[in-house]
Amino acid sequence: TIRDYLHDYKGEEIFVREIRDKEGKVQDAKKRASDFGKTKEEVSKNVLENCIDVRLFGGTIPLNKDSVTFTGPVQFNLGRSLHKVDLKRIKGTGAFASGEGKANKTFREEYILSYSLVGFYGIINENAAKITNLTQGDINLLIEGMWNGTKNLISRSKVGQLPRLLIKVNYKEENYHIGGLLKKISLNKNVDDEAIRSPKNYTVN
């Protein structure tokens, strides 16, 4: 989400992205690393200078006989719904045959949610940020990408998702964060959890 937004809408260089050659083959990680130099020192320096996703999220860059690993200053927790959800299982047929020369199509099965208000939180570690040379400009683009990137999701499972609230906390004390922020959020609902379909059905407390 964030990587796609920063690359497609802000023109930022992204290390972890799909690149195809003239024959349509996907570039592997070692070939991608070679775009930034020949030696370990060259690759490390040039990747950090040019690739905002590595400065933000870190990454492991494989080389021919070695690798470079950067721990990402930005870490997110796994999102979870802030209320009970109406989970439905649907079945359908796929677009392809079940095997070569067969007439029957494959079957697919998936789970969908009628609605869910999903909460995430993350941290930016100032010590790791010094190692990846993360800048305030990078952080500003991260925040922009979190908000606008969500609105630009177009995959089948994510289309229609909208951001509802974004709060950034700046700590005065170094090497400190509150943690467990989702436990400090609750919903005041005017319907049962499973009946929630829009922000009209709740307020955030």
Predicted segments with their positions:
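RNA-binding basic/glycine-rich loop and surface signature characteristic of RAMP-family CRISPR effectors
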Residues: T1-N205
